[in-house]
């Protein structure tokens, strides 16, 4: 499904110009910028997800499709990470939507969404908080080789990996399903 387009406000537009000038090699193409930059827009996107995508989230949460980057993913991580959305609010709204649907929204959608937010995202956040800064430099396998350009350009020859790299380069976003 096609996502709503968020027209950048004046401050966002000026920040985009600064990013382009100061960080020309950063991930993401600013022509694809479609992210909320305030609480109200982030809340609206949460509501839009629950209205338009939530019902199919459970069936497609781990799916990848090179022709449809976002599919039924919530795209809420940047807002949770930056504090524009609160995990508890997201979970409560998802529960409310599920119960009001009287069975229209499948249990795998609500369970999958809540598990991703609470059971995975918040758990890993706790792991980071508990173990940083030493966790940042752990290298269990003691690998020392540098990655070649294929790993930055999406030309490794491994199609799902290449697709994920290219999407990161285009959108500065990769669905969690690529990381499983």
Identify what each model region corresponds to.
Residues 132-176:
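Active-site-adjacent "gating/activation" loops or surface patches in catalytic cores
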């Amino acid at each position: 499904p096609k996502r709503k387009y968020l027209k950048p406000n004046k401050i966002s537009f000026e920040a985009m110009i600064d990013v382009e000038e100061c960080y020309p090699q950063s991930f993401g193409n600013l022509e694809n910028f479609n992210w909320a930059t305030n609480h109200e827009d982030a809340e609206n996107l949460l509501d839009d997800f629950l209205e338009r995508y939530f019902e199919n989230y459970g069936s497609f949460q781990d799916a990848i499709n090179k022709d449809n980057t976002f599919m039924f993913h919530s795209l809420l991580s940047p807002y949770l990470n930056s504090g524009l959305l609160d995990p508890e609010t997201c979970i409560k709204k998802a529960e409310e939507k599920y119960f009001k649907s009287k069975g229209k929204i499948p249990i795998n959608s609500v369970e999958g969404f809540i598990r991703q937010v609470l059971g995975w995202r918040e758990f890993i956040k706790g792991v980071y908080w508990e173990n940083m800064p030493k966790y940042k430099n752990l290298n269990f396998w003691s690998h020392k080789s540098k990655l070649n350009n294929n790993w930055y350009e999406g030309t490794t020859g491994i199609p799902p990996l290449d697709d994920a790299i290219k999407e990161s380069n285009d959108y500065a976003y990769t669905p969690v399903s690529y990381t499983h």
